[in-house]
């Protein structure tokens, strides 16, 4: 019986977490496109080496949505992100790839 109750609590926690993530995406998307737009400007302006520094500075101070976004970007990979920018990927496309839109 205890195992059943524990399993039910676990399933409810997972369901609650998924709903929270679904609610975050509409709010997270514009924040992401704005941030990725800044990264696109850096890369296309020839400051590829500044992308990592910019993200490290921002993410060190981040909380809430920006912290979530930083986690998504780091999980995706900064090198992959730069590669997508150089391939002509838009901010909306890149944010979709990192599951922020």
Swiss-Prot record:
Residues 1-24 form the signal peptide. SMART domains: SapB. Keywords: Antibiotic, Antimicrobial, Disulfide bond, Signal. It is found in: Cytoplasmic granule. InterPro entries: SapB_2, Saposin-like, SaposinB_dom. The keyword Transcription does not apply. Disulfide bonds join 29-101, 32-95, 59-70. Residues 25-101 form the Saposin B-type domain. Gene3D superfamilies: Saposin-like (1.10.225.10). It holds the Pfam family SapB_2. SUPFAM superfamilies: Saposin. GO terms for biological process: defense response to bacterium. Monomer. Homodimer. Hexamer; formed during insertion in the membrane. Forms pores in the cell membrane of host cells. Has antibacterial activity against M.luteus, no activity against E.coli. Implicated in the cytolytic activity of the parasite. This is Pore-forming peptide amoebapore C.
């Amino acid at each position: 019986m205890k195992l059943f109750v524990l399993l039910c609590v676990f399933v409810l926690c997972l369901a609650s977490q998924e709903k929270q993530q679904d609610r975050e995406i509409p709010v997270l998307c514009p924040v992401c496109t704005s941030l990725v737009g800044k990264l696109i400007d850096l890369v296309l302006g020839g400051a590829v080496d500044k992308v990592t520094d910019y993200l490290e500075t921002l993410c060190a101070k981040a909380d809430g949505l920006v912290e979530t976004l930083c986690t998504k970007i780091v999980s995706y990979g900064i090198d992959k992100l730069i590669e997508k920018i150089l391939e002509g990927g838009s901010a909306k496309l890149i944010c979709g790839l990192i599951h922020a839109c």
